[in-house]
A protein has these predicted regions:
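CheY-like receiver
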Residues: 78-81
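Short linear capping/connector segments at secondary-structure termini
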Residues: 88, 121-128
Length: 169
């Protein structure tokens, strides 16, 4: 049995057991959700549609994700990690790290302009507790790595506080 940890609140973790038997169901659910969220939007997609199209039971869905917002958090983690990874691949290694941040921001802006339903996903991610907490923690780590050299007196936790403040603007 593999245990995954989902961040709910700072320093509080809820372990969810994922067995090798449930991994195919998880993949199907995520694939269906991406398709439905992009086609219909997050709010207009129901759990009933998801379980029907993913060919899983309600209990399987709930055991893996608890609720639709659990799927959103999983997708946020994937997107966040991939956006910074993409930004790193795009920027030249000789450029200052701040360019990675600029490119990642441009990627986010471009993605939200491409599709209204994708824009809705971003809005949901930043308003739901679990997803937004993941974003703030992960962004603080990235910002600390990028700007820590310019702000040597600040810790990663300071960057977390700055992220909370600037995210509310």
């Amino acid at each position: 049995m593999v245990y995954l940890q989902l961040v709910c609140f700072p320093k509080e973790v809820v372990p969810i057991a994922i067995t090798s038997a449930s991994l195919p169901a998880k993949r199907r659910i995520l694939t269906v959700c991406v398709k439905l969220f992009l086609e219909k939007g997050y709010k207009r997609t129901t759990v009933a549609e998801i379980v029907q199209k993913a060919d899983v039971s309600n209990s399987t869905f709930q055991n893996i994700f608890r609720a639709k917002d659990g799927v959103l958090t999983e997708l946020v983690e994937f997107m966040f990690d991939n956006q910074f990874g993409m930004a790193r691949r795009i920027t030249d290694a000789d450029l200052p790290p701040v360019f990675v941040y600029a490119v990642e921001t441009a990627i986010q802006l471009t993605l939200t302009e491409l599709n209204e339903n994708l824009r809705e996903l971003y809005t949901e991610a930043y308003t739901q507790k679990e997803a937004s907490e993941y974003i703030r923690r992960a962004m603080a780590r990235e910002l600390y790595g990028i700007f820590g050299l310019y702000q040597p007196t600040l810790s990663e936790e300071d960057f977390y506080a700055l992220e909370i403040g600037s995210a509310g603007m």
